[in-house]
């Protein structure tokens, strides 16, 4: 154990070195944070001490940041032995020029740059422009050349298998630098050319190179140096080193020589990681306990459409001058907060304000170089790791509280950083069953020195343009020391985010930093609103719109119209039409009867029964008598109706239609009796607009219905706005579809009658029949509709030219799809169309948006917006914190003003919860999720109670539905979670394009939403079911989807067995790498849902490339395919010969299931002790001990292994089989080629004691048929019986010489092989494969070119010629010529196929040959 005093001096020296101060300036008891030590440098100390074997952790150091406390910790922790690290030269490490593994962050960037990756298709990239004077191109080129020799990573190559290779230096070759001379070009042209260069370079993916320099010579002896770096090769710290070294070399100064390389560093790290890692293991366990509770990344507002380039980054920056920086950091340190965490907290605050939650994952890159060699700090390469912060700002209302929260999150995570953030992300992905990204990044380079050292700016000029980007990164907030201050900048994929969002966010962060630097009070005061002043002004203007109220009750307008136009039609109904006078008389009769029954002003009257025209008179009479109406429809279950009667404090009941079955505990009147009685005189008294008008019961989240109390004046605001907006009057006729229980009926009745129009009543028998609605519209020339979206959808389906009279159509109460407006315009060209937002608690509607050009609505709209508040109403969109959400940020919609309800009848607690006070006024919390557009338009994005958890993510079903409805050909959609307690997401979709399939929908949806939001099950329906009130019937949708999934046997992605050999092989590879049993991996299971990640995907791809001979497979393919079935389809689609992969897969499976002894025996079966009579290159496949065998002769260039499958088929038919190996290939590669066909046949004949296996049946393909013929001649001369020769796709011996010489040049040989079709052209592009193949083919071609045979040479054995009917090289006539070479029997057979027909007909050919053997 090290003594504490000595330890204290060592620690003081190390800390002083990090801070750049003298050791004696640091008091042992002083808070080191206050002295300038930040979190990043503290973490570097932890890493340094751990490598020395000192057991300390970041959290403990951060809790007591003094030299005194650390001395005690370090002296107590020195008993741990340091971990041994393998030296670079240890055995097993790759040598220079050989591939070596990517570092974890390099691998993440390599995977993420592929197009198929979520947020991929982008390289890690840093581009800088330096504006200076007189940079000399030749000096720059010479300096860059020496720089590339000094830093091998500038020559690195990233290989397709996920490794990297540094090729040897190219000797004296100059580093390429492009020079553009614009010195004599007009200024406007100069600007144009510079802009073009910037546009091209700032977002390019460097092809092959990782470092690019370009120089532009400008007028006035000015220059612009363009520096472009692929950050997969070098991290941000390495960038500083590169530029500093380049500046020194340019100035003629040689940096100190390097005795160590990045490759050696990575090999040492890899070796270290093979040793026991107890700290890493403990940290992994710590993270594993927290994985289930980790939050999502910040859900920032994104752009719905794809019209902007989502890959290009833009930059926002602000420079904190030295005075501001010093003031900010001093105030932070005084509170025990490091500068880096102060800046991080300001960023986190912005993320919380502009995202859906105040708790989120934040990604922090760390720059960590292990001191394995004195030169490590001078190397160029990737030394980064990452840290995931679980940031929770819930309840942190002040800047100080937020900074403390972020700092605590850092301490907690950094204390367990031995298990890096990338590994945590992969574990989180496995836990959730989908790829999880951390695309919002905070990068702190504080403590690393100035971004550009003075030497760089002196040599090359001022950095005038900087931009960086990274794969799978949306927003990278960076802080770095620059020009004596701090540069705060964001590199952001602008096209991903909603317009104006990034500007507002960045401005808010800068404002906060300046506020905190300006004074201490700002740290502890409640934070100002995130709502920018301009946005606040827009909303205030819309919320401030007013219209003078009429001060009348709902029914007053009707009675005035009855006096002014008594004979005008008021109601058209199946029960009889009524004029205004007749309707007034009926209403008066109802009022008189109610009064006679004891009704007092303010009493509540229940209206029960089916929908009829008489109900209009009923509600008018109740209101005229001073009562409040409470409707209960016939669809209500008896128990619920009775609960409503009890909860509703009903005083009287009025039954429309026949007596109801509901037990009514109050005096009851039958409407039919009231209207049949003698007319009663009744004069309405003065009305009170503040009195209650009606109580409507709606569904409650607890299952208990809640009664909404609405006053006359609140409803009148909606009625008056409606009439005013659509300019409704006496000529209008309204289709009254809504039942009295539905708040839409308020407008149907009172807006129509107040404006002097007429109501066309849809009665109970018609209200579920859209064709009846269309007939009524056509018959009565209806002009106005007040509909739910579902009703309009059904009406438009059956309209059939009957809707042309419509001129005002208002739709609300649920998602209003844009296609409704488009379809309506076709059938009712004169109709105005508006979408409305609101609830029963907002007196039907509270907002309105009129569609001006239905045919040209933006294609990315998922719904018609809610619009703007009615006059006298106001709206807010409120975050969970209670703050106003900025534009594009979703929050709960609150409504205030004249048009809101009074509360819930008999539910004071619920009323207090939903009707809240803020800024001196009452607001109704709708439960709707909405967001503001930049112009103050409100957009409905879903319901708070439709949020669900999928794979650990909080998901809004409305967002999924919106994305589905943006897809081409999708007419309507509803998403749900399947019942039964699962988190299986499913969707019902209606399409208007027969080409749209469930799978195509899922594939297209992947471009719009992350993987966890793609429904696992998509079912195509003819129509989305709606409730009677016109809303999506989500219960019915869920039941339909569950039934469909149950019917298809696909409840929750169950196991699906492989159906092909290739699928079995792929399953074996995937299962082995995932560490799962074979039967735990189905062919439709998502690889990433099974726990796969980018690292494991790379291993799978490497395995497939190696074991299944599929060199074209890339990691991006794995991310695109995701399932074994899709991967098999992809691989097969790339094959010229689809059966080849099946054959290769069968070999792999056979080997994978063998023991080591089995493998050795299979690789060389003839070397078994029981078979001493044959050369080892004669491959035997034992099928039987019976006499007789088949001997197979390959084609030119062919190896014995190519006929393994024919041999297996013959063995399956109980036939002993041998396949001979020619020289110059496989295990005979070193054997000299035969000079002639005869010599080759003799060598093969002498390779075994063929008497032991006689009689022989010979099978030769192409050239092999000629070799077999000469073998047969030798056998017959030597007394070895030959039963038959099967000549497959080969010329007859007597015709070979006339064919002329075969090609001998490599290129011609390869072309001939492609023409024959037996070799995959992809393989012929592989240099190593060609090197192995061509010598064998050329040797065979030479032998065959010198062969000749007279036509009268015969063998006694039968000859059976076989070929393909589409073989363009060997015709039927050529095969027939074989008949002249036998004195025995001759047959000719053809199969469908080309020259290598055999691959498609192995079993059939084997059966024919086998039959001949016996």
Swiss-Prot record:
Instruction: Check the record and name the SMART domains matching this protein.
Output: PKS_PP
The record's top EC class is ligase
Q: How is it modified after translation?
A: 4'-phosphopantetheine is transferred from CoA to a specific serine in each of the two carrier protein domains, leading to their activation from apo to holo forms.
Q: Please give the coiled-coil regions recorded for this protein.
A: none
Q: Which Gene3D superfamilies match?
A: 3.30.300.30, ACP-like, alpha/beta hydrolase, Chloramphenicol acetyltransferase-like domain, N-terminal domain of ligase-like, Nonribosomal peptide synthetase, condensation domain
Record's note on what induces expression: The first gene in the probable mtbB-mtbC-mtbD-mtbE-mtbF-mtbG-mtbH operon. Induced by iron starvation conditions and during infection of human THP-1 macrophages. Transcriptionally repressed by IdeR and iron. Induced 27-fold by iron starvation (0.02 ug Fe/ml versus 8 ug Fe/ml). Probably transcriptionally activated by HupB; deletion of hupB decreases induction 10-fold.
List, alphabetically, the InterPro entries matched: AA_adenyl_dom, AB_hydrolase_fold, ACP-like_sf, AMP-bd_C, AMP-bd_C_sf, AMP-binding_CS, AMP-dep_synth/lig_dom, ANL_N_sf
Annotated spans, Thioesterase: 1188-1413
The protein here is known as Phenyloxazoline synthase MbtB
* Organism name: Mycobacterium tuberculosis (strain ATCC 25618 / H37Rv)
The gene name reads: mbtB
């Amino acid at each position: 154990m090290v003594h504490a005093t000595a330890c204290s001096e060592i620690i003081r020296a190390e800390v002083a070195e990090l801070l750049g101060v003298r050791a004696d300036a640091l008091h042992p008891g002083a808070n080191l944070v206050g002295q300038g030590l930040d979190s990043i440098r503290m973490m570097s100390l932890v890493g340094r001490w751990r490598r020395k074997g000192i057991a300390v952790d970041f959290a403990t150091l951060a809790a007591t940041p003094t030299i005194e406390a650390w001395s005690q910790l370090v002296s107590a922790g020195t008993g741990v032995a340091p971990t041994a690290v393998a030296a670079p030269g240890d055995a097993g490490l790759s040598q220079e020029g050989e591939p070596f593994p990517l570092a974890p962050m390099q691998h993440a960037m390599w995977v993420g740059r592929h197009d198929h990756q979520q947020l991929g298709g982008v390289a890690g990239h840093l581009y800088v422009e330096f504006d200076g004077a007189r940079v000399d191109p030749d000096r720059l080129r010479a300096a860059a050349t020496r720089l590339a020799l000094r830093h091998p990573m500038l020559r690195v190559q990233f290989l397709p298998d996920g490794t990297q290779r540094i090729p040897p230096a190219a000797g004296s070759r100059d580093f390429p630098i492009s020079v553009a001379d614009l010195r004599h070009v007009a200024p406007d042209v100069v600007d144009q050319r510079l802009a073009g260069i910037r546009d091209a370079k700032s977002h390019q993916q460097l092809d092959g190179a990782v470092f690019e320099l370009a120089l532009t010579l400008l007028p006035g002896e000015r220059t612009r140096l363009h520096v472009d770096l692929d950050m997969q090769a070098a991290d941000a710290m390495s960038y500083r080193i590169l530029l500093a070294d380049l500046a020194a070399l340019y100035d003629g100064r040689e940096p100190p020589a390097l005795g160590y390389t990045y490759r050696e560093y990575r090999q040492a790290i890899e070796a270290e990681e093979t040793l026991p890692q107890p700290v890493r293991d403990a940290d992994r366990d710590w993270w594993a306990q927290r994985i289930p509770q980790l939050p999502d990344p910040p859900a920032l507002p994104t752009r719905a459409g794809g019209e902007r380039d989502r890959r290009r980054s833009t930059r926002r920056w602000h420079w904190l001058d030295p005075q501001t920086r010093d003031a900010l950091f001093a105030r932070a340190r005084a509170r025990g907060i490091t500068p880096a965490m102060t800046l991080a907290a300001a960023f986190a605050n912005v993320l919380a304000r502009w995202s859906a939650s105040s708790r989120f994952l934040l990604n922090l890159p760390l720059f960590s170089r292990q001191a394995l060699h004195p030169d490590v700090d001078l190397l160029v390469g990737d030394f980064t790791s990452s840290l995931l912060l679980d940031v929770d700002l819930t309840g942190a209302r002040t800047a100080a509280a937020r900074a403390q929260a972020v700092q605590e999150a850092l301490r907690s995570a950094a204390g367990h950083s031995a298990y890096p953030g990338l590994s945590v992300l992969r574990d989180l992905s496995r836990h959730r069953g989908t790829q999880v990204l951390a695309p919002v990044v905070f990068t702190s380079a504080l403590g690393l020195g100035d971004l550009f050292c003075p030497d760089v700016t002196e040599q090359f000029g001022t950095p005038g343009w900087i931009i960086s980007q990274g794969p799978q990164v949306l927003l990278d907030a960076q802080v770095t020391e620059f020009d004596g201050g701090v540069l705060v900048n964001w590199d952001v994929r602008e096209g991903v985010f909603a317009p104006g969002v990034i500007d507002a966010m960045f401005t808010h962060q800068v404002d906060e930093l300046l506020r905190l630097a300006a004074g201490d009070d700002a740290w502890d005061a409640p934070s100002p609103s995130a709502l920018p002043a301009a946005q606040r002004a827009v909303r205030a203007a819309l919320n401030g719109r007013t219209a003078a109220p009429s001060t009348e009750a709902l029914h007053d307008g009707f009675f005035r119209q009855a006096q002014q136009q008594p004979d005008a039609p008021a109601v058209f109904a199946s029960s009889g039409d009524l004029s205004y006078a007749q309707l007034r008389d009926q209403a008066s009769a109802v009022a008189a009867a109610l009064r006679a029954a004891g009704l007092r002003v303010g009493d509540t009257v229940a209206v029960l029964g089916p929908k009829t025209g008489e109900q209009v008179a009923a509600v008018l009479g109740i209101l005229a008598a001073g009562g409040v109406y409470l409707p209960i429809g016939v669809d209500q279950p008896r128990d619920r109706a009775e609960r409503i009667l009890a909860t509703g404090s009903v005083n009287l009941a009025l039954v429309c239609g026949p007596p109801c079955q509901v037990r009514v505990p109050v005096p009851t009147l039958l409407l039919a009796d009231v209207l049949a009685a003698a007319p009663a005189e009744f004069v309405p008294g003065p009305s009170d607009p503040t009195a209650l008008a009606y109580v409507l019961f709606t569904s409650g989240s607890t299952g208990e219905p809640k009664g909404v109390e609405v006053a006359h004046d609140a409803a009148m605001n909606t009625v008056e706005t409606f009439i005013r907006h659509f300019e409704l009057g006496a000529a209008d006729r309204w289709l009254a579809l809504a039942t009295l229980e539905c708040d839409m009926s308020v407008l149907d009745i009172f807006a129509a009658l107040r404006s002097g129009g007429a109501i066309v009543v849809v009665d109970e028998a018609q209200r579920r029949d859209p064709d009846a609605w269309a007939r009524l519209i056509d018959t009565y020339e209806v002009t106005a509709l007040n509909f739910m979206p579902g009703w309009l959808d059904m009406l438009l389906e059956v309209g059939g030219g009957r809707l042309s009279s419509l001129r005002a159509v208002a739709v609300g109460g649920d998602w209003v799809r844009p296609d409704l407006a488009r379809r309506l315009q076709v059938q009712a060209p004169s109709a105005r169309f508006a979408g409305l937002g609101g609830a029963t608690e907002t007196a039907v509607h509270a907002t309105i948006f009129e569609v001006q050009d239905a045919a040209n609505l933006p294609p990315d709209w998922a719904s018609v917006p809610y619009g703007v508040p009615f006059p006298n109403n106001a709206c807010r969109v409120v975050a969970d914190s209670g703050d106003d959400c900025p534009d594009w940020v979703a929050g709960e919609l609150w409504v205030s003003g004249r048009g809101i309800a009074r509360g819930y009848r008999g539910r004071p607690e619920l009323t207090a919860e939903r009707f809240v006070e803020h800024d001196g006024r009452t607001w109704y919390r709708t439960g709707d999720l909405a967001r503001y557009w930049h112009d103050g338009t409100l957009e409905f994005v879903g319901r708070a109670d439709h949020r669900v958890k999928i794979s650990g993510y909080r998901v809004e079903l409305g967002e999924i539905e919106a994305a589905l409805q943006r897809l081409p050909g999708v007419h309507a959609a509803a998403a749900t979670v399947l019942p039964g307690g699962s988190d299986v997401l499913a969707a019902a979709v209606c399409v208007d394009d027969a080409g749209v399939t469930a799978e195509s929908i899922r594939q297209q949806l992947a471009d719009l939403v992350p993987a966890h939001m793609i429904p696992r099950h998509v079912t195509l329906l003819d129509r989305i079911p709606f409730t009677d009130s016109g809303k999506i019937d989500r219960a019915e949708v869920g039941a339909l989807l569950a039934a469909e999934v149950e019917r298809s046997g696909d409840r929750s992605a169950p196991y699906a067995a492989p159906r092909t050999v290739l699928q079995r092989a792929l399953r074996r590879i995937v299962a082995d790498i995932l560490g799962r049993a074979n039967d735990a991996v189905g062919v439709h299971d998502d690889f990433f849902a099974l726990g796969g990640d980018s690292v494991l995907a790379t291993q799978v791809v490497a395995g497939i490339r190696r074991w299944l001979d599929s060199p074209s497979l890339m990691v991006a393919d794995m991310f695109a395919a995701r399932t074994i079935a899709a991967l098999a389809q992809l691989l097969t689609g790339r094959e010229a010969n689809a059966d080849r992969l099946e054959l290769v897969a069968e070999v792999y499976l056979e080997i994978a299931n063998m023991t080591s002894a089995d493998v050795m025996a299979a690789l060389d079966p003839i070397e078994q002790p029981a078979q001493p009579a044959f050369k080892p290159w004669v491959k035997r496949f034992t099928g039987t001990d019976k006499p007789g065998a088949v001997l197979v002769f390959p084609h030119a260039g062919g190896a014995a292994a190519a006929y393994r499958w024919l041999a297996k088929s013959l063995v399956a038919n109980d036939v002993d089989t041998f396949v001979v190996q020619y020289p110059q290939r496989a295990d005979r590669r070193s054997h000299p080629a035969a000079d002639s066909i005869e010599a080759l046949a003799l060598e093969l004949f002498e390779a075994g004691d063929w008497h032991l296996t006689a009689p022989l049946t010979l099978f030769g393909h192409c050239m092999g048929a000629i070799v077999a013929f000469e073998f047969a001649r030798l056998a017959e001369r030597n007394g070895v019986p030959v039963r038959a020769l099967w000549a497959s796709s080969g010329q007859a011996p007597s015709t070979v010489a006339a064919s002329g010489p075969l090609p001998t040049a490599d290129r011609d040989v390869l072309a001939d092989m492609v023409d024959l079709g037996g070799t995959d052209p992809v393989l012929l592009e592989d240099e190593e494969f060609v090197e192995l193949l061509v010598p064998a083919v050329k040797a065979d071609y030479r032998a065959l070119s010198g062969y000749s045979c007279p036509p009268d040479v015969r063998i006694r054995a039968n000859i059976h010629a076989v070929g393909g009917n589409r073989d363009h090289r060997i015709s039927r006539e050529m095969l027939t010529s074989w008949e002249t070479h036998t004195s025995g029997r001759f047959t000719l057979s053809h199969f469908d196929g080309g020259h290598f027909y055999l691959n498609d007909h192995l079993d059939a050919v084997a059966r024919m040959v086998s039959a001949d053997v016996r």
